[in-house]
């Protein structure tokens, strides 16, 4: 499945989503590794098979397999961290904030690609998963590495578009 196939599946009630997907696909403001890593990580985080397949296929044609693997790692590790740290952040019992997480997350320190790109993907997945604590942590690392607000905003915009594509396809499935 390709992005064009994905666009063709988006119904007219979600025309804005389809147009945003087209804009995202042609956007060249990020490096190819940043862009296609976002496609993979956010496609997986969307939990929609069609979205995941189309975006992974698009990325596989554009970047090295190590980028695909690292983006898969970002989606996977954020799937764990976003649940845990969202709980820690939202729980009224603040004792959880001082307890060790006891979760392996070595991939964050050694993702196999540029660490800043991995942080950007992790931020975008954290936005999809709604973990404010993780969003703040990843945004802080990115800002300290002099990543611009525009780059960060673009990553989150891509995440929002990818998530909206998944939702539009789910909504179309109800017709």
From Swiss-Prot:
Disulphide-bridged cysteine pairs: 131-134
Catalytic activity annotation: N(6)-[(R)-dihydrolipoyl]-L-lysyl-[lipoyl-carrier protein] + a hydroperoxide = N(6)-[(R)-lipoyl]-L-lysyl-[lipoyl-carrier protein] + an alcohol + H2O
InterPro entries tied to this protein: AhpD, AhpD-like, AhpD_core, CMD-like
GO MF term list: alkyl hydroperoxide reductase activity; disulfide oxidoreductase activity; hydroperoxide reductase activity; peroxiredoxin activity
EC number: 1.11.1.28
Alphabetical GO biological process terms: cell redox homeostasis; response to oxidative stress
Keywords per UniProt: Antioxidant, Disulfide bond, Oxidoreductase, Peroxidase, Redox-active center
Enzyme class of the recorded protein, top EC level: oxidoreductase
Active site: 131, 134
HAMAP family in the cross-refs: AhpD
Family: Belongs to the AhpD family.
Described purpose of this protein according to its UniProt entry: Antioxidant protein with alkyl hydroperoxidase activity. Required for the reduction of the AhpC active site cysteine residues and for the regeneration of the AhpC enzyme activity.
Protein's name in the database: Alkyl hydroperoxide reductase AhpD
Organism: Brucella anthropi (strain ATCC 49188 / DSM 6882 / CCUG 24695 / JCM 21032 / LMG 3331 / NBRC 15819 / NCTC 12168 / Alc 37)
């Amino acid at each position: 499945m390709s992005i064009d196939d994905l666009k063709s599946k988006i119904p007219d009630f979600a025309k804005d989503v389809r147009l945003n997907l087209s804009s995202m696909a042609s956007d060249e403001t990020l490096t190819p590794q940043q862009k296609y890593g976002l496609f993979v990580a956010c496609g997986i985080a969307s939990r929609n098979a069609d979205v995941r397949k189309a975006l992974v296929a698009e990325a596989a044609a554009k970047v090295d397999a190590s980028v695909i693997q690292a983006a898969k790692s970002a989606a996977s590790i954020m799937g764990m961290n976003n649940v845990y740290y969202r709980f820690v952040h939202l729980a009224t019992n603040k004792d959880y904030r001082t307890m060790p997480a006891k979760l392996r997350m070595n991939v964050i320190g050694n993702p196999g690609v540029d660490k800043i790109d991995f942080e950007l993907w992790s931020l975008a997945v954290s936005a999809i998963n709604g973990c404010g604590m993780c969003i703040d942590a990843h945004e802080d690392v990115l800002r300290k590495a002099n990543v611009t607000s525009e780059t960060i905003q673009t990553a989150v915009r891509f995440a929002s578009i990818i998530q909206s594509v998944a939702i539009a396809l789910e909504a179309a499935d109800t017709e």
